Amino acid sequence: DTYIAAENGIKSIKVKMSSTSEDMISSLNDLAGNYDGVDFISGAEVVGNQEMVRLFGDLGQTLAVPAEGDTEYTFPIGNFFTLLAFLPGEHTFTLTITDMQGNTKDGLLKLTVE
């Protein structure tokens, strides 16, 4: 999991995914079509995103999303492993965090599934 802390409060957490797997890209596009506001290709907002909660609930997983102004959040990257387990390739997660004062930081995580 990825721990996020913002002393000034969290305004936005966007998660963008890319992959060398065409099947993964296709799966992400399918998710975007079925869950409004869950477009990981363009970047999905996590803060307050109840559709993301519904998506992971439909996958049998629990996900809590932060509210705007929260100062901490643990992004459960492991929840995505269900999607990745059968899709070989290099999968990249880019997290962009913006605080309430407009300060922005990016983080990158690459997972390789063989």
What do the predicted segments below correspond to?
Residues D1-E114:
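First exposed extracellular module after export/assembly in secreted or surface-exposed proteins
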